[in-house]
Amino acid sequence: MSDFKHIPKYPVQTLGKALDILNYIKDNPSSEGISLTEISSALKIGKSGVHRLLDTLMAYDFVEKINGISPAYRLGWGLFNAGNAVPKQHTLNGANYVPVIEKLCNTFLETTNLGILNNYEAIIICKMEPAARMLRTNTQVGEREPMYATALGKLFMSDLPENEFENYFERTTLTKIP
């Protein structure tokens, strides 16, 4: 992860903690969910605070509670709904790119990804694989990868002004991506 993210001038700490919880659940997927205790311990937020934040996130369907032997939490469908609205607000200059991606995929019989550059990370926004393909890629729509780690990211780097390209590598620690 690079350090190019926006730093708010006047951060709202409670909102930041709620978003940290969402990101923690996202980054630690489990079909059984994640316990309040684990979230509290990992994020160093008191259990009562985590409980109140989770309760609020449940009210917006961003988190759902799994009732089992001990309650656990997972991402809710409200986030899925919110995420699906993103491409509708970013129309790529009004282009309907799906037919183009389909044609490329079917012509060359190769996995075809369309991505955008966001905070110096490549984000896949559309992926198509040919039906007859035996070997599948493990990339997912919505996945973020550092620019240096993917062909798509390197394509974005090739279009950066030289000073921005140099600044990127001065501020980025290169790590092997699994």
Positions of the model-derived regions?
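Active-site-proximal mixed secondary-structure blocks
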Residues: T173-P178
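N-terminal helix-turn-helix
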Residues: S2-Q89
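Amphipathic alpha-helical effector-binding/dimerization core
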Residues: I69, R74-E170
